Amino acid sequence: MTMTSSTKLVRLNKLLAERGIASRRGADKMIEEGMVVVNGKKVYELGIKVNPNVDKISVDGKTIKGKSENIYIMFNKPKNVNTSMNDPLGRVTVADFMGEIPVRVFPIGRLDWDSEGLLILTNDGEYAQKVMHPKKEVTKTYHVKLEGQPQLYQIKKLLSGVAIPGGKVKAKHVEKLKGV
């Protein structure tokens, strides 16, 4: 909320995401709920811009610190582990495997409960956005074990697109691996 000619203002929700407090949407919710204080005043307005070098910002009574180093964790998610960092049903999550990490990290993308494989966790919101945003067209490769052989119509359906929660996905390429 302070402006100087040499300092770049940033949206408050973006700053909170960069500092590992919450995702941008999560930060918006915190702002709407009055959990964020800038220079001693509760902020409810979404889209507000702040000067990270000057403004005093706290969330839920805790002052946020300067930008921490970005962390990137490659995790081989086992089956029957929830990709989220917490689970209201009390199931095992990837957070249970993280131990003591000095900053909040989050998974980039997700793997289903009964899936296993590489999952990247980070506190770098910009990197996560680059990897996951459809406009960036980052290719992801999945190896899938099936019972039996897929029918031609099923492969065509994968190539033309399949509706899943959150949108439609389609394979660019489908092939049977030799020796599998």
Regions found by a protein language model. Give the residues of each.
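Basic, flexible Lys/Arg- and Gly-enriched helix-loop patches that mediate nucleic-acid binding at interfaces
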Residues: 2-180
